[in-house]
Amino acid sequence: MSDTDGKKPLGLGGGSRSGQVKQSFSHGRTKSVLVETKRKRVVVPKPGASGSSTTTSSPSHLGDPAKRPAGISDAEMERRLAALRAAKLREVEDAKRRADEERQREEERQRRREELEAKEREERERAEALRQKAEDEERARREAEEAARRAEEAKRAPAPAAPQPAPAESRASAPPSAKPGLPPSRKEREREADRDRTTKKDDSRRSGKLTLNEALSGEGGRTRSLAAMKRKQEKARQKAMGFGHKAEKQVRDVQLPETILVQELANRMAERAADVVKALMKMGMMVTMNQSIDADTAELVIEEFGHRAVRVSDADVEHVIDTVEDKAEDLQPRPPIITIMGHVDHGKTSLLDAIRKTSVVSGEAGGITQHIGAYQVKTESGAVLTFLDTPGHAAFTSMRARGAQVTDIVVLVVAADDAVMPQTVEAIKHAKAAKVPMIVAINKIDKPDADPNKVRTDLLQHEVIVEKMSGDVLDVEVSAKTGLGLDELLENIALQAEILDLRANPSRQAQGAVIEAKLDVGRGPVATVLVQYGTLKRGDIFVVGQQWGKVRALINDKGERVDEAGPSVPVEVLGLNGTPEAGDVLNVVETEAQAREIADYREKAARDKRAAAGAATTLEQLMAKAKADADVAELPVVIKADVQGSAEAIVQALEKVGNDEVRVRVLHYGVGAITETDITLAEASQAAVIGFNVRANASARQAANQKSVEIRYYSVIYDLVDDVKKAASGLLKAEVREHFIGYAQIKEVFRITGVGNVAGCIVTEGVARRSAGVRLLRDNIVIHEGTLKTLKRFKDEVKEVQSGQECGMAFERYEDIRPGDVIEIFEREEVQRKLA
């Protein structure tokens, strides 16, 4: 080793080094610069240095300044040592953190390894159990074959001598297949070992309970829990019964509406929603489980999952309505339903009054029937008859049609002094369309000018042949005023009902027809229902048209509350959620949910139908409709009536009012009092509000006064239709009529400055007026039509010139006049038109 001990010798040349650098500038100029480079010596402590010098913060640890590296101050040295300590501390923390992470990773690896070993052990046990089961089955099969073979040999071979009896212990221990006197074979020894192992396994499986002695002695080790024992027993039981195999997929019938949510489709198939979404994505549809798909796509998905699709429609909700045919043994006799029809003022209601021995006509406005009345009459013979009284006015066509649809017998009332009239013919058509028998009642037979034979003859023109004319239609001459022939009429009705043999099942769910509907102020929506099948009871839940409800009360034709109504019984039904349409069918259902669902479906179907009817199919049709509407003036009205039938009759009557130039537009019609909503609607459309047998409430009257909306009240449909006709006639353009008043012959044409050409004329016929219109005729051809600018007589402006006098005329904005032309003078008159 040298004296320097591997260190470099110190020298004096280690301070700084100098040199020159040449700088270049533009235009080829250069400059030499003297550069001095200084080097700093950094002292690093040796690795074996004591740590005490770095842990104290006193100035003594900085050492002797003479031994410190050059250029390092105390503060710099302190900062460097602090940084060194922080670095060592971080290194210790990092090492600790890495050790913790390594330990956690090792624990995770150990846990996974244990799980894998447990899984492998479980797989081995399962495989061992399966192998053991297979061996047991194979061994049992071989033993059965061996036993069968020995039995077959024993049958063929002669009976051997009885062997010497062996000791009891040997017989008990030897297996059945072992032959006496021979040592056990290898297979038998293996079989015995398997049996012992199975027995031990079964004992350990059933040793789940831990006794006190075992716990205190500490023998037996840790046993499995009771839950684990039960799970193992359940697995063994399922394996023995063959449940270990994968269950077969259950094929389901999936109800498929027109549109369905993906989640709902998955629920109906009992599949995971994610699988259904995945299947749809494979089909190119990026949907979520909350989106709807159409029925065709859903059917493809259902078939892909192996199920069967059953298409259903929204209309299937009505299948809950009972439409089963009644059995013959359940049918019982029911009263006949008789509808009285005929022309207005022929005495239908008066005839019914005479039968009921009451007065109904006095209660009808104007003495005419404006509602369908339903009554039950009990005759002297004890028979019960149900009568329907229909209006005879032309506006009530739909009411008569409804009466004919629900009736069994039609009584056609014809006045003997008036014969067959238009509504009589209409009633005959309704009766024939309904295919119901008809009885002709020739009324007003007590009048002096009554001619029943004329009635019978007129009926022949409409293919109604009465018995007295060798036909099959019954006819009776009656007088509602004197009561003549009423008994015979009732006998004929009873005879006809007996022939029809009318029967119905009162035990089924009720079904009936709405004869009339109204909105009562105190009772709400009220429907007059004629029960056709079954029995309607209080508390029944029903659906009628687009409305539904629960029977709150039943009121018969005498105003009495009843608990139930059987077939052919007319009642007023309270408890509806809205006013139904007259003619709707009432059906009783099981639950409110069914009734609400059916009503909602019907309302949606009606709304879609109206939208489809109002929508134009092409742009050309839309433009043509808009052009046609622009040429037609409209009279908007809002109709409110006391009952649904009257409202419909008014609307139908007003639809017939008008022509190609004007029409009545019904903005809204309904049942009940006039409300503020009706006033608001009328004010927005500048319409009038018409109330038929109803009045406006206080708020509606106040709103009408503020908004200047006209409200008109009527109780007779004649007056209502006539007033609307007058109002609609005011929208017609006035008819312009021309009246010829004279001719003038042009003799000479003069040119006057400031006026133009002036014709010197002589009035040849009639009179010439300054305010009249004129036509210029040349060779009997009209070449100009206009007005006069001036009419003078001897330089004086005059209003008219009589025949035979001369005058001067100048035309307004026209000067092509010649001698010999003829001027035709006429006046126009506007005449107000009226609707027919």
From Swiss-Prot:
InterPro entries: EF-G-like_DII (IPR053905), IF2_assoc_dom_bac (IPR013575), IF2_II (IPR044145), IF2_N (IPR006847), P-loop_NTPase (IPR027417), Small_GTP-bd (IPR005225), T_Tr_GTP-bd_dom (IPR000795), TF_IF2_bacterial-like (IPR000178). GTP binds at residues 342-349, 389-393, 443-446. Residues 367-371 are annotated as: G2. Residues 18-27 have a biased composition (Polar residues). Residues 50-60, 167-176 have a biased composition (Low complexity). Keywords: Cytoplasm, GTP-binding, Initiation factor, Nucleotide-binding, Protein biosynthesis. Belongs to the TRAFAC class translation factor GTPase superfamily. Classic translation factor GTPase family. IF-2 subfamily. This is Translation initiation factor IF-2. It comes from Cereibacter sphaeroides (strain ATCC 17023 / DSM 158 / JCM 6121 / CCUG 31486 / LMG 2827 / NBRC 12203 / NCIMB 8253 / ATH 2.4.1.) (Rhodobacter sphaeroides). The lineage of its organism: Bacteria, Pseudomonadati, Pseudomonadota, Alphaproteobacteria, Rhodobacterales. The gene is infB.
